[in-house]
Amino acid sequence: NSNFHATADRGNNILFCSYTPSGGTFTVWKANGVNEKPQKYIEYKTGTNIRFGWKISIQGDLDANALITTPVFQKDSKVQFARWRVVNGVLQTQDPEFVIMSSSLLTSNWIKWADVIYTDDTDTQSDYFLASHVTDTSAKRYFYWFKGTDNSIKAANTGAPGNTIINAVDYAVFNKVPYVIYNQVNSFNYAVTGSDAVRMYDLSSGSFDNQIVVCPDKIYGGLENSGQNTEGTGDVVFKAAKNGYYLYVYLVFSNGGIACYQYDCIDM
């Protein structure tokens, strides 16, 4: 369980987190680039009936300012995540703050598949996004945009079938335009080959109205194991080029493929 998930910031830092079942110590290691030996960065005793570590995300740069988030399961039977703040390159505390999301979401479906990321690297009241298997009163799975001021739902996309797992998200601003991306997978044994997909949105209108096609569905997911993504997992990552010309989208699916797509700001 010492290396369950990895993520990177907007600089050159990488975080590795442990999966921590009830009563364990949630540990996060930090490395400055792929050639540096990881060092312990966060150690937090979780207590009983709490699970940490299925996912971890960073908004910002750990050498400057950042917000670190990880979903929390089975704590007080609420839909919530843990948050750490980094200010001027300094982690503010080993103990996280807990953020409780909209009570309209059904906690019975708040299980291991989830990811959370903020839109700002310093403002804890900025908006954030939730990729998860949680539902509201319907049977569908939705990708949620939350208002950070009161942790209520600001917007939800049109939804995916109930057996779909939405479990990874990333957010970036490219040439002053905000973008969000998430994945959706199917871990069940009746999943057809390539059932996994990626969704990306231009958020400049303040809604999910402007979807951008990243790639055709049914070409990268579930290539092995008879088309089954057993863990129901994958990842999506934005990376903007330093020269401002290109935005790269990276995607990966368990038992599936790895791909990179390039977008530019050139108007032909």
Segment roles from a protein language model:
Residues 22-30, 75-84, 136-145, 187-200, ...:
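Structural motif
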Residues 231-268:
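Blade-level signature of beta-propeller repeat domains, shared across WD40, Kelch, NHL, RCC1
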Residues 2-9, 48-60, 105-119, 162-176, ...:
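Repeated scaffold domains used in trafficking and secretory/extracellular systems
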Residues 9, 16-20, 70-75, 130-136, ...:
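Conserved beta-strand positions in repeat-built beta-propeller and related beta-rich domains
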Residues 29-36, 82-91, 145-153, 200-208, ...:
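Short loop/turn segments immediately following beta-strands, especially the blade-tip
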Residues 1, 37-46, 92-103, 153-161, ...:
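Beta-propeller fold detector
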Residues 166-201:
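Loop/turn-rich, solvent-exposed surfaces of beta-rich toroidal or solenoidal domains
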